[in-house]
């Protein structure tokens, strides 16, 4: 082949024809392939491809109208396709296109300005900066003792941050303290999806209301995000086991206010999903919090943080809340009774303790829960427990 033909490839002007492959070759190997003008040419070529696909879709939509038309032949479609390809090239170059090329030019120009254009090796610069920090003779440093940690130093928070540095779950980062838990964190969490924290809780808790001993009402119907610990496992294998474990402890606490202990257990079952969604501490241990009581200003004991969804005026608001943590479930029952006795707004409920269903209704009226069916659900669970106990006393295993 004549060498003059080879030298002419990519050197001629842009013909503007879609069949001219030399103009595409010039974009790749031409003298100005790194120039600003070439960026616009590449953007226009991309826009022409987009326009061509758009024209194809428009043609295919009209094929149904061409059925039975003797001029709708394969030859006609071939020339029509050639026309559309040339039309897309001409529109992107001469008529200003649809603006897609202009957007690409702005984006590619910013990328080009931010890139290193001096041809220097970035790794060489790193090596120069790090040369003074590393010893030239590693064996000379082998005999030196490592620095001892400071006395009383607590690195647990830093370790938690390091442990949760890789996961992309923002909820887990907030629980580790990487993101502040103050009110700005709640605004940052607004971008999260409704179910973005659900994988951390295999069994969603029932609708409930958080409490605070300092008199500030907190909205219920929340769901809690916890650190990913032993998913799918529960402390209780069945509802019967939950009842058998909780009922003796609930009886001691119920005697203080004269209410039926079954209703306290039923309430704990509704709050925790039969023990499957009890709030956990950061180290994975159980908080034994059966009623979702928050710490409040008067609480000086241990606490467990959790990402909750509160409902304010019908709108879901995500926030990090601190909940009371107990050493046992029995302590949770007694603290719940003390909580009711220490708040005047629940006095009507305490006065109705002899009638457990009325007791739950008065709790709901006092703002204990936002769920309008809360008292009915607790009573239904309590009656179901009574049936289980009657069947067990008869020596017949309960159904289901």
UniProtKB/Swiss-Prot annotation:
Database matches in SUPFAM superfamilies: Lysozyme-like
EC number(s) per entry: 3.2.1.-
Group of enzyme by EC: hydrolase
Active-site annotation: 310, 335
Region entry Catalytic, spans: 238-400
A single Gene Ontology CC term: periplasmic space
A biological-process GO annotation: cell wall organization
Record Pfam families: Glucosaminidase (PF01832), Rod-binding (PF10135)
Keyword check for rRNA-binding: no
GO molecular function annotation: amidase activity; hydrolase activity, acting on glycosyl bonds
UniProt keyword list: Bacterial flagellum biogenesis, Cell wall biogenesis/degradation, Glycosidase, Hydrolase, Periplasm
Domain of life of the native organism: Bacteria
Chain segments carrying region Disordered: 112-155, 204-229
SMART domains (alphabetical): LYZ2 (SM00047)
Localization (cell): Periplasm
Keyword Aminoacyl-tRNA synthetase: no
Function: Flagellum-specific muramidase which hydrolyzes the peptidoglycan layer to assemble the rod structure in the periplasmic space.
Note: Probably exported via the flagellum-specific export pathway.
Family classification: In the N-terminal section; belongs to the FlgJ family. In the C-terminal section; belongs to the glycosyl hydrolase 73 family.
Listed name of the protein: Peptidoglycan hydrolase FlgJ
Organism: Pseudomonas aeruginosa (strain ATCC 15692 / DSM 22644 / CIP 104116 / JCM 14847 / LMG 12228 / 1C / PRS 101 / PAO1)
Gene symbol of the encoding locus: flgJ
């Amino acid at each position: 082949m004549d060498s003059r033909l080879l030298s002419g490839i990519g050197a001629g002007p842009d013909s503007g024809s879609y069949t001219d492959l030399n103009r595409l070759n010039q974009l790749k190997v031409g003298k100005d392939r790194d120039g600003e003008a070439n960026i616009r040419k590449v953007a226009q070529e991309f826009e022409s491809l987009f326009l061509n696909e758009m024209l194809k879709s428009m043609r295919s939509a009209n094929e149904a109208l061409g059925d039975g038309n003797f001029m709708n032949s394969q030859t006609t479609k071939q020339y029509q396709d050639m026309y559309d390809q040339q039309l897309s090239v001409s529109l992107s170059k001469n008529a200003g296109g649809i603006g897609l090329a202009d957007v690409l030019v702005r984006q590619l120009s910013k990328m080009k300005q931010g890139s290193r254009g001096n041809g220097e090796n970035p790794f060489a610069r790193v090596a120069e900066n790090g040369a003074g920090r590393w010893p030239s003779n590693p064996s000379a440093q082998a005999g030196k003792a490592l620095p001892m940690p400071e006395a009383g130093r607590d690195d647990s928070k830093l370790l938690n941050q390091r442990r949760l540095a890789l996961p992309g779950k923002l909820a887990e980062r907030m629980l580790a303290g990487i993101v502040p838990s103050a009110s700005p964190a709640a605004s940052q969490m607004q971008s999260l999806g409704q179910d973005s924290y659900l994988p951390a809780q295999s069994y969603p808790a029932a609708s409930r209301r958080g409490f605070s001993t300092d008199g500030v009402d907190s909205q219920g119907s929340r769901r809690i995000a916890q650190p990913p610990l032993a998913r799918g496992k529960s402390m209780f294998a069945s509802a019967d086991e939950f009842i058998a474990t909780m009922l003796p402890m609930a009886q001691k606490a119920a005697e203080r206010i004269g209410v039926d202990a079954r209703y306290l257990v039923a309430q704990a079952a509704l709050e925790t999903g039969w023990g499957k969604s009890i709030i956990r501490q950061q180290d994975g241990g159980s908080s034994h919090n059966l009623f979702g009581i928050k710490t409040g200003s008067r609480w000086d004991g241990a606490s467990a943080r959790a990402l909750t969804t509160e409902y304010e005026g019908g709108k879901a608001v995500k926030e990090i809340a601190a909940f009371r943590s107990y050493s046992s479930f029995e302590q949770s029952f007694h603290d719940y009774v003390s909580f009711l006795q220490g708040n005047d707004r629940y006095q009507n409920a305490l006065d109705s303790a002899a009638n457990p269903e009325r007791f739950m209704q008065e709790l709901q009226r006092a703002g204990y829960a936002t769920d309008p069916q809360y008292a009915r659900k607790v009573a239904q669970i309590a009656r179901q427990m009574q049936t289980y106990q009657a069947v067990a006393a008869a020596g017949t295993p309960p159904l289901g």
